[in-house]
Amino acid sequence: MSALKFVLICGLVLLLIETIPGVSLNLMRATNRHQCDTNDDCEEDECCVLVGGNVNNPGVQTRICLACSRK
């Protein structure tokens, strides 16, 4: 039961930190970006980038629009 309390307390602390104006841990940053297939699906100052997983474990990967400089 103490492990459950620990998880709940940590979750509440993270939630409080995220709600402080000007402070963000970017926990939801990727989900706020829209998905894309090519750079044409993104704004002019964004690029379509493959995110998620790593070399040893590809896991779940998706393409999202992130800020970049395209010329």
Swiss-Prot record:
<feature type="disulfide bond">
    <location>
        <begin position="47"/>
        <end position="68"/>
    </location>
</feature>
<feature type="signal peptide">
    <location>
        <begin position="1"/>
        <end position="20"/>
    </location>
</feature>
<keyword id="KW-0964">Secreted</keyword>
<comment type="function">
    <text>Elicits an uncoordinated twisting syndrome when injected into C.elegans, but has no effect on mice.</text>
</comment>
<feature type="propeptide">
    <location>
        <begin position="21"/>
        <end position="29"/>
    </location>
</feature>
<keyword id="KW-0165">Cleavage on pair of basic residues</keyword>
<dbReference type="GO" id="GO:0005576">
    <property type="term" value="C:extracellular region"/>
</dbReference>
<feature type="disulfide bond">
    <location>
        <begin position="42"/>
        <end position="65"/>
    </location>
</feature>
<keyword id="KW-1015">Disulfide bond</keyword>
<keyword id="KW-0960">Knottin</keyword>
<keyword id="KW-0528">Neurotoxin</keyword>
<dbReference type="GO" id="GO:0090729">
    <property type="term" value="F:toxin activity"/>
</dbReference>
<protein>
    <recommendedName>
        <fullName>Augerpeptide-s7a</fullName>
    </recommendedName>
</protein>
<feature type="disulfide bond">
    <location>
        <begin position="36"/>
        <end position="48"/>
    </location>
</feature>
<keyword id="KW-0800">Toxin</keyword>
<keyword id="KW-0732">Signal</keyword>
